[in-house]
């Protein structure tokens, strides 16, 4: 579960290394880019949810700089995800992929496994870039 002030690793090559969640937004992609409706009153973000985050640590000469405010989709959480078949999956660390306003990743690679729930939320580009989908 990700809430404001939570720090996340970045799972892409956009140049950022660490993010801090500022706000939990909607969940998923609509017909034309991100769904409208603002943030609502969600307290926690789970896998596949979109957050607004601040870049806390960045690599030099990257696409994003430290201090930038970006949108990101959560791809891994250390809190267990319960699935419809009764199984659960959890990851070692929280991680996110930085996206643009159309919901496409800003980086060209995704590092580490991602959860299968991203496919249900229509983040197909992230799923196709990931080396493993669990």
UniProtKB/Swiss-Prot annotation:
What is the top-level taxon of the source organism?
Bacteria
Which molecular-function annotations from GO does this UniProt entry contain?
Answer: large ribosomal subunit rRNA binding; structural constituent of ribosome
Q: Which GO terms describe its biological process?
A: translation
Q: Name one Pfam family in it.
A: Ribosomal_L14
Keyword terms, alphabetized? Ribonucleoprotein, Ribosomal protein, RNA-binding, rRNA-binding
Annotated Gene Ontology cellular components are:
cytosolic large ribosomal subunit
Query: Entry's InterPro entries?
Result: Ribosomal_uL14 (IPR000218), Ribosomal_uL14_bac-type (IPR005745), Ribosomal_uL14_CS (IPR019972), Ribosomal_uL14_sf (IPR036853)
The membrane-spanning stretches of this chain are: none
Summary of subunit composition and partner proteins: Part of the 50S ribosomal subunit. Forms a cluster with proteins L3 and L19. In the 70S ribosome, L14 and L19 interact and together make contacts with the 16S rRNA in bridges B5 and B8.
Family designation? Belongs to the universal ribosomal protein uL14 family.
HAMAP family named among the record's database cross-references: Ribosomal_uL14
Q: Spell out the protein name for this chain.
A: Large ribosomal subunit protein uL14
Originating organism? Deinococcus geothermalis (strain DSM 11300 / CIP 105573 / AG-3a)
The primary gene name is: rplN
